[in-house]
Swiss-Prot record:
<dbReference type="GO" id="GO:0070301">
    <property type="term" value="P:cellular response to hydrogen peroxide"/>
</dbReference>
<comment type="similarity">
    <text>Belongs to the peroxidase family. Peroxidase/catalase subfamily.</text>
</comment>
<dbReference type="InterPro" id="IPR000763">
    <property type="entry name" value="Catalase_peroxidase"/>
</dbReference>
<dbReference type="GO" id="GO:0020037">
    <property type="term" value="F:heme binding"/>
</dbReference>
<dbReference type="InterPro" id="IPR019793">
    <property type="entry name" value="Peroxidases_heam-ligand_BS"/>
</dbReference>
<dbReference type="GO" id="GO:0042744">
    <property type="term" value="P:hydrogen peroxide catabolic process"/>
</dbReference>
<feature type="region of interest" description="Disordered">
    <location>
        <begin position="1"/>
        <end position="22"/>
    </location>
</feature>
<dbReference type="InterPro" id="IPR010255">
    <property type="entry name" value="Haem_peroxidase_sf"/>
</dbReference>
<dbReference type="GO" id="GO:0046872">
    <property type="term" value="F:metal ion binding"/>
</dbReference>
<feature type="active site" description="Proton acceptor">
    <location>
        <position position="106"/>
    </location>
</feature>
<keyword id="KW-0349">Heme</keyword>
<dbReference type="GO" id="GO:0004096">
    <property type="term" value="F:catalase activity"/>
</dbReference>
<feature type="binding site" description="axial binding residue">
    <location>
        <position position="268"/>
    </location>
    <ligand>
        <name>heme b</name>
    </ligand>
</feature>
<keyword id="KW-0479">Metal-binding</keyword>
<dbReference type="Pfam" id="PF00141">
    <property type="entry name" value="peroxidase"/>
</dbReference>
<keyword id="KW-0408">Iron</keyword>
<comment type="subunit">
    <text>Homodimer or homotetramer.</text>
</comment>
């Protein structure tokens, strides 16, 4: 293909020179649709990481491959790797432990509880932008060091699992006892397009408002950092001010003060930072590097560029006298020295012990010693009052520190894995932890097909409406987040705080529905969980609504959900799952929302792992079924609500209707008859986007066709069933789907 110049005209436009041009739009040549219409709704996130980019094939089962792996052999190879220093990137102190810990930490540390995105679960550190973030400088070397191990074991261990395991083995190889390890993180094969911030430059910080209020859903203080600036806020070496940043960013990663102190102190017991010289001598990141660099970035012209001359960031700090051995030296140095501000050889602000003795080893010259040094953010653990109490307790009680770090490290590296049902391997801890959102195991015989049919009949005869049943089932299941695998219908946490009190769930109406379903369950001859009844009720209502529309449909039902208790539910941890907006229910909350309603719809659809067509058919179906929050009539484009027709699409695309903004209510539109101007419908931005956005309109047209009534119902039922079962990892693991399914 001929290379186009940067000022080339739009693809396909006449060319004065008559030269042939490549018909495929490339990023560097010519403009893309996004360049011409930057404000257009982007639904491309719904179609990423599909089978089209997966080289493993549709039949590949990573869980099966991992469980066939000789994990101890991998661990043995990783132990050997730790001290096998390579000339092209020599190991500090003869041990790669510190580097591997940093790699694992930074893989997991992108996790943010606000939307569950980031984290170690998909191996995204291999791809841009994470592979080229300033805070991830030289972690490309860590992954290259791991390549022989990955190459040896191939598809039996993912990069995502291997990076976390390498961090664990690094800790174990340096004398620390970890809490455990679970495999099960499947790799993805293309970068995830996430919102990492509004800035257009590395280390920019346009993400604040008011009194340093960090905007949601972000979890780091600057573009390209994992957490905080180690030199202090915007380079201001103030440990107390830095503590505020630390607390906020770690909180957004679901860590409390004790876990935060344990992680910082535990991680900084090992290894060092690298600021040997002028950072301007460091070359481009991996994504910006030359072809011949083969994906390695940050090539430095300072000295040898590695080893004693390595430059990763700015500070040059070693925290411990034994940087390759677990100890309490971090706290000993922190509390038993007074600190004075200084600069690293790279010019970064850091701290050194006043009148300190040279007791810290040099990473490459055993004859040399250094004075103890600390980062501004390390001193926060001493000078912030709350952190100081915890730090001093850890200093005086090393066993408490070790236990706290082991638990916090496990949480850090497993927080985005979801329920224990996803955990694989012989090193999974036996102890159940509250942050894992535990659900009791099945303790009773499950209902069969006849039972399910009988229960459906009782539910439909209970007086509960189609709207009641569909809304409740959707509210329960749609809390699922494919990002960190949390939420979903299993556990029936919709009956517990905080979900039972969320505005979007209409608490008073919800309580009435749940009470009736619980009564039906108690009066039935067999034990059945409320979680199963909620889903079964939604299924029954949809099947009836479809039948009323003249279409027979059966939604597969797989029993086995259980009911969690309030004691098994961390209220604060579940609070971020509350929808600020839910376009499927035409709900826009009163809380601050940084997205337009239609953008929030796509965001939620992506968390639900829906495709564009699935999102489209669900919105259209839920509207006519009356699932809107508070019974809103916006988008209910039908004369027969409660009947599963394709009326939403037919009436939205009807050219006899014209649309205009409604007076007095932002984001609401009136659909009026073109001839008489009589009001026919009202709709929101979410409703009208399916007629305005060209791709969504194309999907909508499919369901508005005269002969598509049956297709609409079948597609809606399939998408509905998908959402109801997104969290059924227990079924996926045991392979019981077909065996237990009620058709």
């Amino acid at each position: 293909m001929e290379k186009q110049s940067n000022d080339a005209a739009v693809a396909g436009a006449p060319n004065d020179h008559g030269a042939a041009k490549c018909p495929v739009a490339h990023t560097a040549h010519g403009r893309r649709n996004r360049d011409w219409w930057p404000d257009a709704l982007d639904i491309s996130t719904l179609h990423r990481n599909s089978s089209l980019s997966d080289p493993m094939g549709s039949g590949f089962d990573y869980a099966m491959e991992f469980e066939s792996l000789d994990l101890q052999a991998v661990i043995k190879d990783l132990h050997a790797l730790m001290t096998d220093s390579q000339d092209w990137w020599p190991a500090d102190f003869g041990h790669y432990g510190g580097l591997m810990i940093r790699m694992a930490w930074h893989s997991a540390g992108t996790y943010r509880i606000t939307d569950g995105r980031g984290g170690a679960g998909a191996g995204q550190q291999r791809f841009a932008p994470l592979n080229s973030w300033p805070d991830n400088a030289n972690l490309d070397k860590a992954r290259r060091l791991l390549w022989p191990v990955k190459q040896k074991y191939g598809d039996k261990i993912s990069w995502a699992d291997l990076m976390v395991l390498a961090g664990n083995v690094a800790l174990e190889s340096m004398g620390f006892k970890t809490f455990g390890f679970a495999g099960g993180r499947s790799d993805v094969w293309e970068p995830e397009e996430l919102y990492w911030g509004p800035e257009g430059t590395w280390l920019g910080d346009e993400r604040y408002s008011g009194e340093r209020q960090l905007s949601e859903p972000l979890g780091a203080v600057q573009m390209g950092l994992i957490y905080v600036n180690p030199e202090g806020p915007n380079g201001n070496p103030d440990p107390v001010a830095a503590a505020k940043d630390i607390r906020e960013t770690f909180f957004r990663m679901a860590m409390n003060d004790e876990e935060t102190v344990a992680l910082i102190a535990g991680g900084h017991t090992f290894g060092k930072t690298h600021g040997a010289g002028d950072p301007s001598l460091v070359g481009p990141d991996p994504e910006s590097g030359a072809l011949e660099d083969q994906g390695l970035g940050w090539k430095s012209k300072f000295g040898t560029g590695f080893g004693a001359d390595a430059i990763t960031g700015g500070p040059e700090v070693t925290w411990s006298q034994t940087p390759t051995q677990w100890s309490n030296s971090f706290f000993k140095n922190l509390f038993e020295n007074e600190w004075e501000l200084t600069n690293s050889p790279a010019g970064a602000k850091q701290w050194r012990a006043k009148n300190g003795q040279a007791t810290i080893p040099d990473p490459f010259d055993k004859s040399k010693k250094r004075v103890p040094t600390m980062l501004t953010t390390d001193l926060s653990l001493r000078f912030d009052p709350a952190y100081e109490k915890i730090s001093r307790r850890f200093y005086e009680n090393p066993d408490q520190f070790a236990d706290a770090f082991a638990r916090a490290w496990f949480k850090l590296t497993h927080r985005d894995m979801g329920p224990i049902a996803r955990y694989l391997g012989p090193l999974v801890p036996k102890e159940t932890l509250l942050w894992q959102d535990p659900i009791p195991p099945v303790d009773h015989p499950l209902i069969d097909e006849n039972d399910a049919s009988a229960l459906k009949a009782k539910i439909l005869a209970s007086g509960l409406s189609t709207s009641d049943l569909v809304s409740t089932a959707w509210a329960s299941a749609s809390t699922f987040r494919g990002s960190d695998k949390r939420g979903g219908a299993n556990g029936a946490r919709i009956r517990l705080a905080p979900q039972k009190d969320w505005e979007v769930n209409q608490p008073k109406q919800l309580a009435k529905v749940l009470e009736k379903l619980e009564t039906i369950g108690k009066e039935f001859g067999k034990k059945v969980s409320l979680a199963d009844l909620i889903v079964l009720g939604g299924d029954a209502a949809i099947e009836k609504a479809a039948k009323d529309a003249g279409v027979e449909v059966k939604i597969p039902f797989t029993p086995g959900r259980m009911d969690a208790s309030q004691e098994q539910t961390d209220v604060a941890s579940f609070a971020p799952l509350e929808p600020k907006a839910d376009g499927f229910r035409n709900y826009i909350g009163r809380k601050t929302q940084f997205l337009q309603p239609e953008e929030a719809l796509v965001d939620r659809a992506q968390l639900l792992r829906l495709t564009g067509p699935e999102m489209t058919v669900l919105v259209g179906g839920l509207r006519v079924l009356g699932a809107n929050t508070a019974g809103s009539k916006h988008g209910v484009f039908t004369a027969t609500p409660g009947v599963l027709t394709n009326d939403f699409f037919v009436n939205l695309l009807d050219m006899r209707t014209h649309w205009q903004p409604a007076g007095g209510e932002e984001g609401v539109y009136e659909g009026r008859d073109r001839k008489t101007n009589a009001l026919k419908w009202t709709g929101t931005r979410v409703d009208l986007i399916f007629g305005s956005h060209s791709q969504l309109r194309a999907f909508a047209e499919v369901y508005a066709w005269a002969g598509s009534k049956e297709k609409f119902v079948k597609d809606f039922a399939a998408a509905w069933n998908k959402v109801m079962n997104l969290d059924r990892y227990d079924v996926a693991r045991t392979g019981e789907t077909k065996k237990a399914a009620v058709v």
